[in-house]
């Protein structure tokens, strides 16, 4: 790699050139710049999609720009790429106009210009990007005195002169961007900025959530830390703006019927049996594809799903989650490096495991209080004691014992949350509960729980990949061949809230009946109809809105899984010190 334009200690390997578009992002928000250029994270929005389509039209008409010595009096060259070797920046220009021997870069923007005190003007980020274009043109010997941005929404061209002040300011910004990219930590989020609600990465960045988590930690500092004065470190009360959409418009696709085949026609998945078309699903309307048992999928369909960033998840006939296919969209390697390093740090593993297990026990207790006809006081008191012991535990091994004792108390009273079915007597199998069993499950309730935990493991594995984690390197759950340990870590507090609740809903509302099970040897399995009924109950639960106790806004459980995964990433990257485990009242 060529020398950087400034003298810095690089904490990571950097590309040779800084794109002008990334200077635009840095001027808008250094944190956004870091996510997009360093971590390789990006999220589409309506504006980014429309802007990309418009730039594709410009790029399709690419024409060469003559050398500076051979420049004609008038020419329009499109999609021109040049670099500045001194500053290590590169710019792809939508249009370069040549009039009277002088060149002018023209950049196309989707939005509208800024209204300044003296009329229309460029936004600061657009001005910086255009200045970089002027720099690369001058470096290549072209006379360039000004630039133009064409704003499509208003159809207006706004000019800016490339004076010494603008070019010097932009050069300093380029140096700051290189330093930020090379630094070990991510820039802090903007505080109460009006830029955040319109940013396509707000669901990844979580600016207000990160700041609120930091403030909550300050309020909860141990008493002994109060013996020391820490100037400037006072708790700040903040409200979280509702910038994250409560629900995703995308839905998972479950294919449960044995023998069906999945193909692709254009941007549409087609599900067929041997004779007819059964179902169609647009790629733009689904977030994942789940194949249960003997379901075939074509290479063309897999390729299309990988290109669209939609994972394909594979389950056995019995509901065991055993594989996933994803595209090459996992770019956040620096998060994974930190994850691997902290997985070897006993203090971090113990602290995170305490919170995960404590949160799980608290949520088990809450579910009993909500749904049990008459929960035993001894059970509730025992669970509270187990939660307190988890917070004081000295090792992961001790936590495993505490978790096991809490599970015995919780599942010992689980039957009190199942309503008796009047039609059950005629069925071969019943929703009797005699304790937790698995591998294989030996009764209908345990068959539902096992399937539910498998599906939730899948959803958190997908969330881990989306954030940039390696789902197989956990903290509380130690790595084991074929086990997504980190997904199992994250799902601990959600087992009772999502799966156990969905199982109770499926049974108590008749979405799954005792006739939807078959006995195979010593195990019990769901029929195709039974699995379909449970998936309906599970997705109903995942779509339920719940209030986050720390941020005080309502989101669906599916959205919550991603938020909590990203909060763990904030902990691992050192932005916040303690994982805010999700518990409900």
Predicted segments with their positions:
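Short alpha-helix boundary/capping segments
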Residues: 118-128, 165, 293, 297, ...
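Active-site helix-to-loop segments that bind/position phosphate- or nucleotide-bearing substrates
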Residues: 59-66, 80-83, 229-263, 272-274, ...
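Metal-dependent nuclease catalytic regions and adjoining charged, substrate-binding loops involved
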Residues: 2-10, 73, 120-121, 136-219
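A surface-exposed, charged beta-strand/loop segment in the N-terminal or early-internal portion
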Residues: 107, 285-366
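Metal-dependent nuclease catalytic cores in nucleic-acid-processing enzymes
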Residues: 120-148, 308-312, 454-461, 496-501
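Terminal-proximal segments
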Residues: 236-317
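Short histidine-centered catalytic/ligand-binding loop motif
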Residues: 109-123, 159-164, 290
């Amino acid at each position: 790699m060529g020398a950087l334009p400034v003298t810095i200690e690089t904490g990571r390997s950097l590309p040779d050139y800084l794109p002008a578009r990334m200077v635009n992002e840095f001027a808008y928000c250094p944190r956004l710049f870091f996510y997009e250029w360093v971590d390789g994270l990006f999220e589409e929005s309506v504006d980014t999609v429309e802007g990309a389509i418009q730039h594709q039209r410009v790029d399709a008409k690419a024409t060469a720009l003559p050398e500076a010595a051979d420049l004609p009096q008038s020419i329009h060259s499109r999609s021109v790429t040049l670099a500045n070797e001194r500053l290590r920046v590169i710019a792809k220009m939508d249009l370069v106009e040549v009039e009277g021997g002088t060149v002018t870069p023209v950049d196309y923007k989707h939005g509208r210009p800024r209204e300044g005190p003296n009329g229309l003007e460029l936004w600061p980020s657009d001005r910086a990007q255009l200045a970089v274009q002027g720099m690369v043109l001058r470096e290549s010997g072209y006379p360039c005195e000004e630039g133009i941005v064409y704003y499509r929404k208003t159809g207006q061209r706004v000019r800016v002169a490339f004076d010494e002040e603008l070019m010097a300011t932009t050069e300093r910004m380029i140096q700051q961007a290189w330093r930020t990219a090379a630094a070990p930590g991510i820039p802090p989020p903007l505080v109460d900025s009006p830029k955040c609600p319109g940013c396509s990465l707000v669901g990844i960045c979580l600016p207000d959530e990160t700041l609120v988590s930091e403030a909550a930690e300050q309020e909860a500092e141990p008493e002994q830390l109060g013996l020391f004065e820490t100037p400037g470190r006072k708790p700040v009360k903040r409200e979280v703006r509702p910038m994250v959409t409560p629900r995703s418009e995308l839905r998972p696709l479950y294919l449960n019927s044995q023998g069906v085949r999945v193909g692709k026609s254009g941007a549409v998945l087609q599900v067929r049996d041997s004779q007819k078309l059964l179902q169609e699903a647009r790629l733009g309307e689904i977030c994942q594809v789940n194949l249960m048992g003997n379901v075939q999928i074509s290479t063309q369909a897999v390729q299309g799903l990988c290109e669209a960033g939609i994972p394909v998840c594979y389950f056995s006939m019995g509901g065991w989650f055993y594989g996933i296919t994803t595209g090459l969209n996992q770019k956040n390697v620096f998060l994974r490096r930190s994850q691997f390093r902290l997985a070897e740090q006993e203090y971090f593993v113990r602290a995170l495991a305490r919170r995960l297990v404590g949160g799980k026990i608290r949520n088990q207790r809450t579910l009993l209080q909500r749904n049990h006809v008459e929960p035993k006081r001894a059970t509730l008191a025992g669970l509270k004691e187990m939660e307190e012991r988890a917070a004081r535990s000295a090792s992961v091994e001790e936590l495993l014992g505490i978790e096991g004792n809490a599970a015995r108390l919780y599942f010992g009273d689980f039957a009190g949350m199942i309503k008796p079915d009047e039609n059950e007597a005629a069925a071969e199998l019943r929703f009797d509960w005699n304790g937790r069993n698995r591998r294989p499950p030996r009764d209908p309730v345990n068959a539902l729980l096992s399937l539910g935990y498998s599906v939730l493991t899948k959803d958190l594995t997908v969330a881990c990949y989306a954030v940039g984690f390696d789902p197989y390197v956990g903290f509380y759950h130690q790595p084991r061949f074929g086990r997504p340990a980190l997904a199992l870590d994250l799902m601990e507090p959600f087992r009772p809230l999502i799966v156990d609740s969905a199982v109770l809903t499926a049974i108590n509302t008749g979405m799954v009946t005792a006739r939807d099970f078959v006995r195979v040897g010593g195990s019990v399995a769901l029929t195709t109809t039974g699995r379909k009924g449970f998936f309906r109950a599970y997705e109903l639960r995942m779509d339920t809105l719940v209030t986050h106790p720390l941020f005080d806004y309502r989101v669906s459980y599916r959205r919550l899984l991603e938020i909590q995964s990203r909060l763990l990433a904030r902990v691992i990257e050192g932005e916040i010190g303690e994982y805010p485990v999700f518990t409900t009242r």
